[in-house]
């Protein structure tokens, strides 16, 4: 059940960000990290990319939730947390590559 609910929430969040992307950098809505908020171009890409990853991760987690049913609650919770961490890591890696291709790290981090 955890995987189904968590996966569903990830899918909904991803769809909402895809349909209604935050237009400008803000501290309320969107993919907010130091790197993504350092530049409008990075902000736009972070929200676009992470929304796609959230939808994909949500589908995988929801599928696992359907397969596992209410069994293995801890495993479903671990998979949900892993999906969030992987989404964060892949998005930050993409932003870092974009930043370095522009000739420097604008966030002040290496």
Curated annotation (Swiss-Prot):
Keyword annotations from UniProtKB, A to Z: Cell membrane, Membrane, Transmembrane, Transmembrane helix
Disulfide bonds: none
Gene Ontology cellular component list: plasma membrane
Cellular localization per UniProt: Cell membrane
Chain segments annotated as transmembrane: 4-26, 46-68, 72-91
Recorded topology in the membrane: Multi-pass membrane protein
Protein name: Uncharacterized protein YfhL
UniProt gene name: yfhL
């Amino acid at each position: 059940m955890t995987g189904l609910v968590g996966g569903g929430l990830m899918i909904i969040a991803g769809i909402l960000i895809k349909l209604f992307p935050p237009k400008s950098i803000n501290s309320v809505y969107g993919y907010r990290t130091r790197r993504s908020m350092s530049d409008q171009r990075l902000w736009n890409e972070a929200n676009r990319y992470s929304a796609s990853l959230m939808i994909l991760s949500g589908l995988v987690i929801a599928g696992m939730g359907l397969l596992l049913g209410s069994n293995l609650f801890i495993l479903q919770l671990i998979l949900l947390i892993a999906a969030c961490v992987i989404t964060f890591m892949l998005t930050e890696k993409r932003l870092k590559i974009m930043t370095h291709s522009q000739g420097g790290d604008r966030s002040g981090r290496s």
